[in-house]
Structure formats: C-alpha cells, structure tokens
Amino acid sequence: RGIIKTFDTLDDFNAFQVYAPEYVFFDVLGDVVCGGFAVPIRQGYADEVVIVTSGEKMALYAAANIKKALDNFQERGYAKLRGIVLNCRNVPDEVAIVEDFVQRIGTEIIGVVPRDSDIQRAEEQNMTVVQMDSELPVSQTIIDIAKRIMVPVEEQKEGAV
C-alpha cells in the first residue's frame, strides 16, 4: 500500500506536471516485486525499466520476477526492460553469472558498478560517491552508466555511445 500512496501523493501535488522530469527513478525493493512494483508501470509512470542487481541468488530471483512482470505487461504496451546494471557484491564469478542471466532473459548489461569502499565512505557522509568525489574511478563508472541510460537505444545502435 505504501507505493500506491506515494503515487497518489505525487498526483495530488501534480509533481510530474510541475517539474516535467525527463527521468524518474523508482527504487523498489526486490521483495515488493509482486504488488508494488507494478504500480508505476500500470499507471504509465515508466517507459523503460533498468534493473539493478548483484550476482547473488535472491537478487537474481527478484530480477527474474521483475522481468516476468514486464513480459506480462508488454502485451498492454507498458514499460519495457532496458537492461541490467550489475552492482557487484564480490560474489565469486559474479560477472559471468550475471552475463549468463542476461542472456537467458534476453537483455544486456548496461554497466557494472564494482564493489568499492569509496561508496561506503560516501554513505557515511550522507552523500553519493559522485557527490563526494566525481573524479574517483567508481564515480566515473556510475557517470558513464548514467550517460548510457540517457542515450536512446536507437542512437546507441548507431554508434553514439
């Protein structure tokens, strides 16, 4: 019910009309996939979905459930899966595991965020790592992923990224 209330509140304040954002990020916990995740998709708040996952079994299970939900919604013209961002947790063979996963579900890895202590250091300062120091290698990785998400898929295929 919390996610539904969130969108009702955004509607009450006409947030999307007032701010006209180009990108809106919904951070949905993996265990909310069934009910809550569907709200932004069914109500037209999302055109594309980027799943952030690790190579951990339960994270991939949640990602697979999101993909199944998107497949079910696809017939109705709702949001489609743009790809996967791998947020590394230092699982053995993690990149290979996620590469196999994306191949099985028919998508791609948009980018890989390495496990990096600078991220935790930034969190301790109540900042993102990019806010803390945009020149760090991990910050540059995140910026590159963001740029890739911002470029339409069609332009990427034409060699823009």
Residue spans of the language-model regions?
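Generic structural signal for well-ordered alpha-helical scaffold segments
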Residues: F7-N14, D71, A146, M150
